[in-house]
Amino acid sequence: MAESNQNTDGAVEEGEDENTGDSNLQMELSAFRAKWMSELQPSSGGQRSFSRNAELRRRQETAKEEKARELFLKAVEEEQNGAVYEAIKYYKSAMQLVPDIEFKINYSRTPDPERGGSYLESSENNREIDDLLTYFQHQLTLGNDAMKLCEHETETSQVHISALPFEVLMYIFRWVVSCDLDLRALEQLSLVCRGFYICARDPEIWRSACLRVWGRSCTKMLPYSSWREMFLERPRVRFDGVYISKTSYIRQGEESLDGFYRAWHQVEYYRYLRFFPDGQVMMLTTPEDPLVTVPRLRSKNSRMDSIMFGHYRLSQDTDNQTKVYVVVSKRKEEKVSEYQRSRFCRRNPVPEAERSFHVGLQLSSGGRQRFNKLVWIHHSCHITYRSTGETVVTAFDVDKMYTPLFFARVKSYTAFSERPL
């Protein structure tokens, strides 16, 4: 009995030793696996530190770029105010921080909260106003018994323009547009205040401008939604400048005496077309530079002998292309007596024929401007003989020598107003 108990105790001790050995083996194996995994991933901690450093550098770059942006915008503001030296200092500081800040900057101005930049309700700050005219009219009439188009910002002892009646103010606006149809000045005037914006959108002004351009062919504004849209979208010639084309070619000169040398000449000349709202047109072909010629085309009373005067009309054919037809001729001389004061001097004989030139042009748009290109489609000379009344027509081939005319706006043409619209 005692021997059996001893055998049982020995078996239990051997089982406990085996369990202890297995647990130690498992612990050693787990430690080995952990060490092995740490050896396989030695840079995991380094990657975390690298990502933190990259994030820190990115924040520093963003802060530096924001600082450079503020300095650059400050330099722009100082330059606009005339403080050139201060502007140079800010420009230099901005360029030292970010050399290419000029190309990264966004010039759109954010509204200033101190000056009422949030003129819309908070729920409408990011929503585009569909009908700005209706909105401004509502703002002016809201809470005002007597609507005023504008109010003076500072106190003044003189009479402010807001004291003028609406009819007088509209008459001033017609003077701004003038008989030259300077609608560009009207658009600039509408930027002054909300009241001027409303006056500049008056349909009668735009209707009068459309009637000056298209006459009886625009009695209805369909398919356009307004007279202003018709004036801006419908093809027309422009009056606030001149259409210019440049043609150049090379021709042979005369041979030298020894026959070994022949000169070559590069010939350049310009064509100018100036349109007026009353249907008149001036045409000039000359080798003179536009810097010299353009000021002479400001008035219809120009004294240049080479200028041809005439009239034009707009035509929209079935192919939906707008064409301009021009008829020009030399201005007739004033009638003088047959004999001058000196009996030995006769005046120049009356020409036996009259010459006129007929031009056909196709109106199109090129680049970012509208209606700024005229392409030649026809050019002919009509000679009418006084003795017989016969007219001879000579048509010219429209080839590459007839380069398109492009519009150039001339500020001096609309600098003064002679008559209201």
Swiss-Prot record:
One of its GO terms (biological process) is regulation of TOR signaling. It comes from the Eukaryota. Residues 40-52 have a biased composition (Polar residues). Pathway: Protein modification; protein ubiquitination. GO terms for cellular component: cytoplasm; SCF ubiquitin ligase complex. Residues 11-20 have a biased composition (Acidic residues). PANTHER family: F-BOX ONLY PROTEIN 48-RELATED, F-BOX ONLY PROTEIN 9. Part of the SCF (SKP1-CUL1-F-box) E3 ubiquitin-protein ligase complex SCF(fbxo9). Substrate recognition component of a SCF (SKP1-CUL1-F-box protein) E3 ubiquitin-protein ligase complex which mediates the ubiquitination and subsequent proteasomal degradation of target proteins and acts as a regulator of mTOR signaling. This is F-box only protein 9. It comes from Danio rerio. The lineage of its organism: Eukaryota, Metazoa, Chordata, Craniata, Vertebrata. The gene is fbxo9.
